[in-house]
Each structure stands twice: as C-alpha cells, then as structure tokens.
From Swiss-Prot:
It comes from Oryza sativa subsp. japonica (Rice). The chain crosses the membrane at residues 666-686. One of its GO terms (cellular component) is plasma membrane. This is Receptor kinase-like protein Xa21. Belongs to the protein kinase superfamily. Ser/Thr protein kinase family. Enzymatic activity is fifteen time stronger with Mn(2+) than with Mg(2+).
Length: 1037
C-alpha cells in the first residue's frame, strides 16, 4: 500500500530525532538519497539535502531551514510555495537564493522539487557540476546559476526542461561544447546567457531554432569556427546578440543583417573578416549598438549605416577598414560613441573631411576616436561645431597638418583631448581656455610654436598637460599655477626661455612628473620646489639654469628621478639629497659643481644610477651604497677625486697628518665617562618603569586569535636566529618558526622604534580579525608582551608560505641556472586570478570593506600548491560608507603604499579607496607579464612601466613580454599559421590591456574587481588545452 505524505513526514522526523540534532542535515541527505517519494515531505527533504551539501550556508540566510512541521518549509528564506487554494498547496514553486553567500555543490536532490518553476542560485560561491537531475524539473521556467564557480559541461539533459524561458549560466567555469539540445528542445527560451565561461567548439546551428529568443549572449568564451547562418532565423523579437571575445572566424553571414528587431550586436575581439555588405544596415532600423572592434574586417564603411537611425554606439576600431570615412553619419541623431581608431582610413583632399560636417548633426555625440589612422591634411573648422556634449576627442598618431581650429574652445564638454604625434603647426588657440572641464590635454610631438597661451591657466580641472617636443617659445606662463589639480606637466624639447616660475611649485597635486628639460630656461631652481613633497620625477636637464641646487629638494620625499645635467649649476651637492630614500636616478653631470661628494648619498639604498661626471668635485669618493657598484656610477671629468672602490681606478687619498701629542685626550675621556653614567642611570630608570607594568594585561587581542607569549616565540624561532630570518622591512622582520599549534609559521616582529610600526600592527589586526578567504594570508595568533629587556614587544604569527613570494619567482636574485624558478603563463594567470579574488572579497564581500593600500609582488605569497595569498595589511584601511575609517590629514597620513605601485592620487593626499588597490593591481599585472619591476632601472623618467607596455602594444608585443615566457619570440609572433601560438599571443595582449585598464590615471576609469575576474577567467580558459610546444616557438604555459 502506498504511504501517505503524512506518514512519510512522520517517519522522516523520527529518523532525524533518533540520529540527533548534530547530524540532522546528513540524515536529510541520506533520506532524500534513499527515497524518491514526492509530495510536501519530499520537497522538504530535498531542501534539507541541498542545505547539507553546502559548505557555507550563508550565515542567517538558511538559519530558518529546519524540520519544523508539515508545510513549514514554505516560510523558509528563499522558498516560495504554491497558493493554498490551488490543487497542490505547500509544493515548492520557487527557490530564490541569489547573493546568499552560499558555497558548496548543488545537490542533485533539487531535481525532486517537481513543481519548481524558478531556481535562482546566482551570485554565490557554488562549485562542482550542474547536476543532470535538474532535467527532471519539467515545470522549470527560469534557471539562473550565474556568478558562481561551477565547472564541468552543460548537461545535454537540460533539453528536457522544455518550458524554460530563461537560462543563465554565465560567469562560471563551464567547459566543453554548447549542447545542441538547447536549440532543439527549448522552444520557449527567450533569454540565453552562457557568457564568461570556457565553452569551446562551434556554435550549434540548432540554436537557430530558438524562435522566441530575445537576449542571446555567448561572449567571453573559447568558441571557434564560423557564425552559423541559421542564427539569422532567430526570433523576429531578438534584441541583443553578443558573441564578442571568442575565436570565431570567417565572415558575418548575410542572414544576420536581416534581424530587423536587433538592438545590440557585438562580435568584437574575434578573428572575423571580410567586407561588410553595402546594404548591411538596410533593415536594421532599430539597431542601437554595434561593436565589431579588433577583428580583420576591411573595405569601406557601408553607406547604409545611415539607415540605423537609432544607433548610439558604432565601434569598428582595430580593423583594416580603409578609404574615405563615409559621410552618412549626419542622420544618426542619437549617436554618442564613434570608435574608428587603429584602422587605415585616410583623408587626401579637404573634402575627405566632410564626415566631420556630417557629425555636427549628432548633437548627442560624446566620444570620437579617430586615432592611429592615415588621416592627413588640415582639420576643417567644422570640428569646432561638434556637439558640446563631446567629452573625448582623439586625433593622435595621424598625419594631420595645419593649425588647430581656433574655435576648438566651443567644445565646452571636452574632458580628454589627444592631438599628439601629428604635424600640427601654428600656435595653441587661446580658446582652449574655455574648456573648463578638460582633464587631459596631450599635444606632444607636433610642430606647434609661439608662446603657451596664458588662457591655459583657466583649465582648473586639468590633470595631465603634455606639450613636449614642439617649438614653443617665450616664458612658461605663470598662470599654470592656477592648475590646482595638475598631476603631470610635460614641456620638454621646446624653445622656452626665462626662469622656471616659482608659482609652479605651489601646485600641491603635482606628483607624477615635471619635465621642463631641453629648453633655454635660465635662473636658479626655485627654493619652492620643496613644497612638492609627493613629486616622483623632476627633469630640468639641458637648459641654462645656474645658482645652487636648493636644499629644499630634500623635502621631495617621493622623488625617484632627478635630472639636472647639462646646466650651469654651481656650488656643492646639498647633503639634504641624502634624505631622498626612494631616489633611483640622479644625474648632475656637465655642470660647474664643486666641493666634496656628500656621504649622505651613500645612504640612498634605491640609488641605481648616479652621474656626477664633468664637474669640479674633489676629495674622497665613498665606497658604500650606490658607490659600491662601479656600473651604476659615473664620475669621470673630476680630476681632484680620489679613493673609492678599486673598479673606479682613482688615485689613493693622502691621509691627514695626525698630531697625537697635542690631542686633548683627558678632557674628552672624562666627558665620555660622565655621559655614559647619565645614560646608564636613565636606562635603569626606564627599564624599572616598564617592568612595573609587566603584570598589566595587554589590550591588544583579536577575537578567535589567542595571544602567544614572548618566550614561546623565542623558542619557536631559536631566539630569532638569523638563519630563520625570511625578510625585513621598515615596520618589522619576519622569521620562520615552529609552534606547537602549527607545523611551521611565519613570525613578524614589529620594529617599534619606528613610530609607524605600531599603527601598522593595529591596522593589520583590525583589518584581518574577521576576514576569512582562501586567498588571504591567515593570522594564526598574535603576541603583545614585553621582551627580556623590558621593552614593548609585538608580533603577528601567520601561516607559513613555503613557496615564498611572487617577487621571488618573478625576480629571482640568483643567476645560477640550476636554481632558477619558472612560472609559466597559465600559472601566472592563475596567481593573478587568486589576487583579484582576494581583492574582490576585501572590497565587496567581507564583513566590512577593506582597502589593502600596498598591493605588490612581495606581498603576494605562495603556498605549497602555488595558490596565491595576499598578505601584509600594515597599511590597510577599513571603509565605512566608502570612506576610510581612519581619517587623517594629508600631512599626517603621508604616502600610502610602495613607490611604483601606489596610485597617483595617493601622492596628493587622497583618502584610501578601492580604486587605489586596483591601480596597484594593474601595475602587478604588467609586472608579471613583462618580468620588469615598476622601478626597473632601465626605465626613463618619461618611459615608465605603463608607457613601456603601451609602446609594445603599438609595436611588437614580444619586445615587452618576459623572456622566460618566450624562447623564440620572433617565430612566435610571426607564426601566422599556428592557432595555439595565436591564442597565446591574444592572451598576453589581453593581460597587458587589462593591466593598463586597471592602472589608468583617473580612478573612476579603472576596471572593477568583478570585471577583472571575468576577464581573467576568460583568459585562463583560452589557455587551457594548448600544446606545450608550438611550431616555430617554444613556450611555457
């Protein structure tokens, strides 16, 4: 006899009671596995089994899920049951647990919820595979599993859910082919989102049978082959088709151009080619967005584009389009974005610029990028009549001549203006002063002349002003001091004269660079330069500057590059330059400097390049610090120098004669004895005072992290033996140790003599006390005590990371081939993904938002499985409502992070933000791909890591890629018939572009962590399955 639902419920409850509360979830799982009984009780058991399969149950989200009686599961969080008046009350019809912080696998038991219509588990941390049992949900209409870490393939059995209208499996780690069953059986599907996975193979032609489809997104996968022509048979109500960032090839089928309902169409970043049919846009009247960038399309822009009258974005950059730009844009009254850069467009005659007059009818135009083409001739005055909404205008890297339109100041909405690398002549129009919203003005490498207009001082929002390599003359305008948001100023290689205006150094925001080199500037360097405490680069070489080097340069604490060579400077080198602890390059050559070389320069540990040649220095050359390496210093042309290391080949210095007979030994000896007695008394008094406090308990503790004693740490580290020293920094030293509670640990002993070390200790404890993530270094315990001398002692004990830091792997110190470490490309991408996940957790998913403030390769530690863990939270900031919890003034807060990695806005005292971490992460991405530190000595002041990569992307990518990744870069890049090699190239290019996108100057322009993770997952999946050796190239991955 069949059992009733009530008896099933009672039996299940008795089973749970007999087993006991502690194993209730396991009991539910077992019961669900042993029975296929349906009904209300079956629904409850299926839900409890699902709960038991989770590793993390979302805190309070599933707290209500327990065996509480018939039908009570309908009150559980996320559970929706059918109405009581209906035929089947208490049956689960919806399970909605989006963003519930769940982790674990999706239990097959959910396949028993036979009345389920909607299942939404998106934006959690679920893993494992999609259970085929879900195909039993014959009533299912909505299945959303996006934003998890689900692996495996899409089960073909999903085709049995024939009532599905929405299927979203995006942002996971799915692999394999797209089942043809989706197209063959899911006739009611209106939404299909499979993007941002690792799906491969061809797009099934059966997808063309989805006659109800409205939203279709397969982007960011590894799909290959041609676009099926059957997709042109899709629903007449299809709104979006997104196929970007795959490996699709061939031409766009003509049938696609007949999808008259289409609103958005994207195929960018593929290998598609061919010409666009002349009538392609004839029926696409509703099209709003078309993105075909970074492909191999050629020919002309079809005139039929004018028929797409609703078009807002047209992006065809990075192709081989050529000829004259069409003049049909004037009918696109809703156009906001036009990307034509990096093509082969040309303008031979003045009438070829007619499309600009056409664009003046586009009153909503915001972005116009014509850079990197073959545009020539003179700009028409109609440029000044473009929309006042235009915020981005790029004409760089063309062959444009003539003058800049005098009324360009009419474009009052401009925020970015790129005119560099052309042949512009004449003067800068004074109307530029009307562009009050302008943030970036780049016009270097032209033939501009005349004086720099005073009206430039009206651009108070300007961040970047680069006018170098032109023919400007006259004085540097004093009105530049009005640019109170300026970060970088480049005026090099012009004919400027007069003094450097002292007002320039009152711009407190100037932090990236001042470059006034290679001009005819005169006078002295203003003392006010010391106001720029955050300045990184100062170039004033090759001028006619005279007078002394100002002592105040020593106040520019963040200065890394100082170039003053080829001037008329006199006097001695101020010893204050020794305060510039981050200085890497100092060039004072070819001046009239004299006196001794100050020994303080030897204390600058970062100084790798020092040029003092062709001056009149005298006396002994130091032998330590920068002076210990002859390859990094140049001192020729100073005839009166002596001493130094042997490699300098200088004469020995004559020792001074000592007159010991008249040396006042006795008075000095008595004074020393007295001083020592006083100091000893003070020491005993201080020690006694500290020991009286020893019994008082320390207030420094962390919930869940019991304190450990000083004596335990002494024992664990063999008395902090030098053999156990792992590394040392400004705030502390790290030792390897062994505690009873852990096999091996890392013990960070704070250097409390540094006043900032205690703040570092507090910040790290505060930031990590409630943090739990697989990619964060775990704190084992802490110690806040007194050492055996009565001094305060503080230490943090972490999990030991046996594989060392990422810095050790990217920049190994040893040159012994037998001891070289190698990270292949796939491993590097995995490490970057680990770090991105850690930052995503800190910024968005932790108990409270935390900004790390010091993301760099030495703070990324690797465990025995090479999983990356972000550590060293000594500079971290907890945010409350997006604002740093620890509010300090600019002067007291100082500079955050490490030179080279720190965001430029930190240099001007901005509050810590997640955008700053993203900038540092971007630099880390570039470092891990290029193998170069951001402070590499090969970089010039005008060519940092970002510029170095940008040049590589515009030229030969192999020139900037770490040589450890390429054994034969020439064959690799030119191996056009080798698909795996092309894919590796694409992955590296994508990584470099990601690094540049994350490290943009403007904080709000940087890529958010969620998008970073999506991009890295796509890159990682694109690398999977490649052969380890490519024909014509040997690569690691």
């Amino acid at each position: 006899m069949a059992r009733s639902p009530t008896s099933v419920m009672i039996s299940s409850l008795l089973l749970l009671l007999l087993i006991g509360p502690a194993s209730s979830d396991d009991a539910a799982a077992a019961a669900a596995a042993r029975t296929s009984t349906g009904g209300v009780a079956g629904d409850e058991l299926a839900l409890l089994s699902f709960k038991s399969s989770l590793l993390h149950q979302g805190g309070l989200s599933l707290a209500s899920w327990n065996t509480s009686g018939h039908g009570q599961h309908c009150t559980w969080v996320g559970v929706v049951c059918g109405r009581r008046r209906r035929r089947h009350p208490h049956r689960v019809v919806k399970l909605l647990l989006r963003s519930s912080n769940l982790s674990g696998i999706i239990s097959p038991s959910l396949g028993n919820l036979s009345f389920l219509r909607e299942l939404d588990l998106s934006d959690n941390y679920l893993s494992g595979e999609i259970p085929p049992e879900l195909s039993r949900l014959s009533r299912l209409q909505l299945l959303e599993l996006s934003g998890n870490s689900i692996q495996g393939s899409i089960p073909a059995a999903i085709g049995a859910c024939t009532k599905l209208t929405s299927l979203d499996l995006s942002h996971n780690q799915l692999r394999g082919m797209i089942p043809r069953e989706i197209g063959a059986s899911l006739k009611h599907l209106s939404n299909l989102y499979l993007h941002t996975n690792g799906l491969s193979g061809e797009i099934p032609s059966a997808l063309g049978n989805l006659t109800s489809l409205q939203y279709f997104d397969l982007s960011c996968n590894r799909l290959s082959g041609a676009i099926p022509s059957s997709l042109g048979q899709l629903s007449s109500s299809l709104l979006t088709m997104n196929l970007r960032q795959n490996n699709l090839s061939g031409m766009i089928p003509n049938s696609i151009w007949n999808l008259s309902s289409l609103r958005a169409f994207s195929v960018s970043e593929n290998k598609l080619g061919g010409m666009i049919p002349t009538n392609a846009f004839k029926t696409l009247h509703l099209l709003e967005v078309i993105d075909m960038g970074t492909n191999r399309f050629y020919g002309k822009i079809p005139a039929s584009v004018a028929n797409a009258s609703h078009l807002t974005q047209l992006q065809i950059d990075g192709n081989l389009f050529s000829g004259i730009i069409t003049s049909g844009f004037g009918r696109l009254r809703n156009l906001t974005t036009l990307y034509l850069w990096r093509n082969l467009f040309q303008t031979r005659e003045q009438e070829d610029w007619g499309f600009i007059s056409d664009l003046t009818n586009c009153s909503k135009l915001q972005t116009l990028d014509l850079g990197e083409n073959n545009l020539g001739g003179v700009l028409p005055n109609s440029f000044s009549n473009l929309s006042t909404s235009l915020s981005f205008l790029a004409l760089d890297l063309n062959k444009i001549t003539g003058s800049i339109p005098k009324d360009i100041g009419n474009l009052i909405g401009l925020q970015h203006l790129y005119l560099c690398n052309n042949n512009f002549r004449g003067s800068l129009p004074s109307s530029l002063g009307r562009l009050r919203n302008l943030g970036i003005l780049v016009a270097y490498e032209n033939n501009l002349s005349g004086s720099i207009p005073l009206a430039i001082g009206n651009l108070t929002e300007l961040n970047i002003l680069l006018l170098g390599t032109n023919k400007f003359s006259g004085w540097i305008p004093y009105t530049l001091s009005n640019l109170t948001n300026l970060l970088s100023l480049g005026l090099s290689t012009n004919n400027l004269s007069g003094p450097i205006p002292s007002e320039l150094f009152n711009i407190q925001t100037l932090s990236i660079m001042i470059n006034v080199s290679k001009n005819n500037l005169e006078g002295s360097i203003p003392q006010e330069i010391g106001h720029l405490k955050n300045l990184v680069e100062f170039h004033a070489e090759s001028n006619r500057l005279s007078g002394k080097i100002p002592n105040t340069l020593g106040d520019c604490q963040l200065l890394r590059y100082l170039y003053l060579q080829n001037n008329l400077l006199s006097g001695s080198i101020p010893s204050a330059l020794g305060q510039l602890k981050g200085l890497e390059t100092l060039d004072l050559s070819s001046n009239n400097l004299s006196g001794q070389i100050p020994t303080s320069l030897a204390d600058i540990t970062m100084l790798h390049s020092l040029n003092l040649s062709f001056n009149s220095f005298m006396g002994e050359v130091p032998t330590i610090g920068a002076f210990a390496d002859a390859s990094g210093i140049s001192i020729q042309g100073n005839a009166k120098l002596c001493g130094g290391i042997p490699d300098l080949h200088l004469p020995r210095c004559c020792p001074l004669l000592e007159n010991r007979k008249h040396f006042p030994v006795l008075p000095i000896s008595v004074s020393l004895v007295a001083a020592l007695a006083i100091l000893s008394s003070l020491y005993l008094l201080i020690t006694w005072h500290k020991r009286t406090k020893k019994g008082a308990p320390s207030r420094t503790s962390m919930k869940g992290h019991p304190l450990v004693s000083y004596s335990q740490l002494v024992k664990a580290t063999d008395g902090f033996a030098p053999t156990n020293l792992l590394g040392s920094g400004s705030f502390g030293s790290v030792y390897k140790g062994k505690l009873n509670i852990q096999d091996h640990v890392a013990v960070k002993v704070l250097k409390l003599e540094n006043p900032k070390a205690l703040k570092s200790f507090t910040a790290e404890c505060e930031a990590l006390r409630n943090m739990r993530h697989r990619n964060l270094v775990k704190i084992v315990t802490i110690c806040s005590s007194i050492d055996n001398r009565g001094n305060d002692f503080k230490a943090i004990v972490y999990d030991f990371m046996p594989s060392g830091s990422l810095e050790d792997w990217i920049h190994p110190e040893t040159n012994d081939p037998a001891d070289q470490r190698h990270l292949n490309l796939h491993r590097r991408v995995t490490i970057l993904l680990d770090v991105a996940c850690a930052l995503d957790y800190l910024h968005r998913h932790g108990p409270e938002p935390v900004v790390h403030c010091d993301v760099k390769s030495s703070n990324v530690l690797l465990d025995s499985d090479m999983v990356a863990h972000v550590g060293d939270f000594g500079l971290a900031r907890i945010l409350v409502d997006g604002t740093s919890l620890i509010q300090q003034s600019t002067s007291s807060m100082g500079f955050r992070g490490t030179i080279g990695y720190a965001a430029p806005e930190y240099g001007v005292g901005h509050i810590a933000s997640t955008h700053g971490d993203i900038y540092s992460y971007g630099i880390l991405v570039l470092e891990i791909v290029t193998g170069k530190r951001p402070t590499d000595s090969t970089f010039r002041p005008d060519l940092g890591l970002r510029q170095y990569v940008e040049l590589g992307l515009h030229g030969r990518v192999t020139d900037v890629v770490d040589t450890k990744l390429i054994l034969d870069s020439e064959n690799w890049l030119n191996s056009t018939n080798n698909s795996p090699c092309r894919r590796i190239t694409e992955c590296i290019v994508s990584l470099l572009r990601l690094g540049l996108s994350c490290s943009q100057v403007l904080p709000l322009s940087r890529t958010p962590t969620g998008d970073i993770i999506d991009e890295l997952n796509a890159i990682k999946q694109n690398l999977s399955g490649l052969f380890p050796v490519c024909e014509g190239a040997s690569l690691e991955f």
